[in-house]
């Protein structure tokens, strides 16, 4: 029971988002009857293969994860089902959260490198323009 409450506390920060003045669920956590917290399906609304495959890759890098896969429910629906199964005592929500954090860090690194390259290009272009005068 305490583990379930702890799991709910961890998930409470990412469950909902505000859309057009009303509360809309962005993420659902689904457990099949008879399963434990080590095998969970996360339903991510308004997402597609872009996040699904990237997140699956980041989660599978965790050696405690036995299985991670995702499916799109239907081409006309914007949601994915991401299933995580872990080994040992690690609840599935932890690699999910770590995968999101790791993916955000990778995206931030790519953005930083991209912006630095743009700045370097503009600086080089400006110095070439000054040299021609």
UniProtKB/Swiss-Prot annotation:
GO cellular component: RNA polymerase I complex; RNA polymerase III complex
Function of the molecule: DNA-dependent RNA polymerase catalyzes the transcription of DNA into RNA using the four ribonucleoside triphosphates as substrates. Common component of RNA polymerases I and III which synthesize ribosomal RNA precursor pre-rRNA and short non-coding RNAs including 5S rRNA, snRNAs, tRNAs and miRNAs, respectively.
Family: Belongs to the archaeal Rpo11/eukaryotic RPB11/RPC19 RNA polymerase subunit family.
Subunit structure: Component of the RNA polymerase I and RNA polymerase III complexes consisting of at least 13 and 17 subunits, respectively.
Keyword Nucleus included in the entry's annotation: yes
GO BP terms in the entry: transcription by RNA polymerase III; transcription elongation by RNA polymerase I
Protein name per the record: DNA-directed RNA polymerases I and III subunit RPAC2
Lineage: Eukaryota, Metazoa, Chordata, Craniata, Vertebrata
Gene behind this protein: POLR1D
Organism: Bos taurus
